[in-house]
């Protein structure tokens, strides 16, 4: 079974539907959702009309609950003809035709009257205090989110060519990557992708290694469809370099994205879904050949990027949310028709078609939410709104999005018919509105870092993925899943977290790192031997001779390897 299949697979735990956790909440059996949507639609003009109407309707409907089933939207024959109002009909009947030339239409007369009225109104003196002041949120900037502490050393552990150790494909403890110190490169950020690694330097340069699967590692000297176990520089074309200095990276399963200081977003590599490569748009083909601009700063300034397995989430300076890529699991948050999303709604350089409406209904009134932070990982997206609340969409098969799975859809025949995907933004009550969280990551579970340095976790807890140390095995029906956030105990203030499939890592303000979960390839960096128990129930400190005299300032964990940035004491 491939890693991607494991992320969405839920068959390894067979438990009753009505499990009860320590909080007394019923916890659902998390079955794999079907990847198919409500059914294929015929292509053509009818579908285009249907989609446009559907998108328009989406912006005016409340989205505060889980979509129970992928809706089968009936074809619409168009809007009924609008009857003229009494005043308009009267105005049209009063029109007198001119003596010569074509007859004047009633609408022209009405427009003339309206324009005349508007002009006279504009010339009237304005009454003081008539206009209500409009509140405008301050613009966001990339330096609120971009890494700023420069490191001295890059280390890696785990398995594969993405480690960046020439001739060595396995290391159970963090080992320094020689090239950065040999060439005097100062690392600023490291991101671990599914089959690759990327490091951003203080000069805005990007170094990569790993498997070059359809443009995943477009570094110098790497053959097409080849691979490299040594970090090499990515050389960008002149038109890409004009977009500004790179200040932030994000990596998915086999793609990478970069944010520039001018607000442009660049991406390269390939996207996948359950049917294979996602390449329905020319831009997605270009990404496989070389880095390309996917959102241009001249059209929209982006200040933060975050990546899931096969989708990218972007936050612009005005607090608008944009999503890009595959939406099969609902992670784009823009449509419940995940199988028939037109290509222009997956890719658009202006960003106009990538916008996610954050419109909700409360007490009969609609209101819009401005986003102030975004998070993405696995097959989901989470948004922190200016109203203090958190909103989520995407795969929710273990209640990891902070939204309880509706148990009412378990049929009398015992079949689990619950919809485990949230297609449109919905409030995630489990996060509450009292705390500010600065990072959220994970796949089937999520690890959550608060601004106060406290760490929480939620979702699937088999293999003690939440770090609570209370799951005892497959017969444990009480602790295998949590749909409310649980605090993980640490002795010091935590400043960073990273999580992927059943694995997590956290590091403290004093430069110490901790790891927990299920160590499959040595990615936890704890030096576990083949005969050792691979399940690490609670956070354990990471140590290495290559870390002596250094403090950890950043880390990124993936399915098979982990990257670490350290600063000399």
Curated annotation (Swiss-Prot):
Basic residues composition bias: residue spans: 73-82
Lineage top rank: taxon: Eukaryota
Residue stretches of biased makeup (Low complexity): 85-96
Xref: SUPFAM superfamilies: RCC1/BLIP-II
Positions annotated as RCC1 repeat: 263-318, 388-452, 511-568
Biased composition (Basic and acidic residues): 1-10
One of the protein's GO biological processes: cell division
Annotated PROSITE patterns: RCC1_2, RCC1_3
Compositionally biased spans, kind Polar residues: 108-124
Location in or out of the cell: Nucleus
Note: Loss of ran-3 causes low levels of chromosomes to misalign on the metaphase plate and segregate incorrectly in early embryonic cell divisions.
The protein, known as: Regulator of chromosome condensation
Species per Swiss-Prot/TrEMBL record: Caenorhabditis elegans
Lineage, uppermost ranks: Eukaryota, Metazoa, Ecdysozoa, Nematoda, Chromadorea
């Amino acid at each position: 079974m491939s890693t991607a299949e494991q992320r969405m697979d839920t068959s390894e735990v067979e438990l009753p539907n009505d499990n009860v956790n320590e909080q007394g909440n019923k916890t659902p059996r998390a079955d794999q959702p079907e990847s198919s949507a409500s059914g294929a639609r015929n292509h053509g003009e009818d579908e285009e009309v249907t989609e446009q109407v559907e998108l328009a309707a989406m912006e005016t409907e409340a989205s505060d609950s889980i979509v129970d089933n992928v809706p089968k939207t009936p074809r619409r024959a168009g809007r009924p003809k609008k009857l003229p109002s009494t005043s308009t009909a009267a105005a049209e009947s009063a029109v007198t035709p001119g003596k010569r030339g074509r007859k004047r239409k009633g609408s022209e007369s009405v427009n003339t009257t309206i324009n005349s009225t508007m002009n006279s109104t504009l010339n009237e003196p304005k009454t003081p205090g008539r206009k209500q002041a409009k509140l405008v949120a301050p613009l966001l900037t990339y330096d609120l989110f971009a890494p700023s502490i420069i490191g001295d050393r890059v280390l890696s552990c785990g398995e594969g060519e993405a480690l960046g150790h020439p001739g060595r494909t396995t290391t159970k403890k963090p080992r320094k990557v020689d090239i950065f110190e040999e060439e005097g490169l100062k690392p600023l950020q490291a991101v671990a992708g599914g089959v690759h690694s990327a490091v951003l330097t203080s000069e805005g340069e990007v170094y990569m290694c790993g498997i070059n699967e359809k443009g995943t590692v477009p570094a110098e000297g790497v053959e097409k469809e080849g691979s490299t176990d040594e970090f090499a520089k990515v050389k960008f074309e002149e038109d890409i370099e004009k977009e500004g200095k790179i200040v932030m990276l994000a990596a998915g399963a086999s793609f990478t994205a970069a944010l520039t200081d001018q607000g442009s977003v660049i991406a390269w590599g390939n996207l996948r879904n359950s049917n294979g490569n996602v390449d329905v748009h020319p831009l997605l083909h270009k990404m496989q050949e070389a880095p390309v601009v996917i959102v241009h700063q001249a059209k929209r300034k982006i200040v933060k990027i975050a990546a899931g397995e096969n989708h990218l989430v972007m936050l612009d300076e005005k607090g608008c949310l944009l999503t890009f890529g595959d939406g099969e699991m609902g992670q784009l948050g823009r449509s419940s028709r995940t199988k028939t999303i037109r290509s222009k709604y997956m890719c658009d350089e202006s960003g106009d078609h990538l916008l996610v409406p954050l419109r909700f209904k409360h007490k009969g009134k609609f209101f819009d939410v401005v986003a102030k932070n975004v998070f993405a990982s696995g097959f989901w997206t989470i948004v922190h709104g200016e109203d203090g609340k958190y909103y989520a969409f995407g795969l929710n098969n273990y209640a990891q999005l902070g939204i309880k799975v509706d148990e009412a859809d378990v049929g009398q025949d015992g079949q689990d018919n619950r919809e485990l995907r949230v297609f449109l933004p919905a409030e995630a009550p489990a996060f509450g509105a009292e705390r500010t969280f600065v990072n959220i990551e994970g796949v089937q579970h999520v690890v959550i870092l608060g601004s106060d340095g406290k760490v929480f976790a939620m979702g699937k807890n088999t293999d003690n993925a939440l770090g609570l140390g209370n799951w005892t095995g497959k017969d444990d029906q009480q602790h295998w899943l949590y749909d409310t956030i649980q605090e993980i105990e640490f002795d010091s203030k935590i400043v960073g977290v990273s999580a992927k499939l059943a694995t997590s890592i956290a590091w403290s303000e004093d430069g110490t790192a901790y790891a927990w979960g299920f160590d499959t390839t040595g990615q936890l960096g704890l030096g576990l031997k083949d005969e050792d128990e691979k399940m690490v129930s609670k956070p354990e400190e990471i140590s290495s001779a290559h870390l002596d005299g250094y403090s950890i300032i950043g880390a990124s964990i993936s399915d098979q390897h982990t990257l670490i940035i350290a600063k000399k004491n």
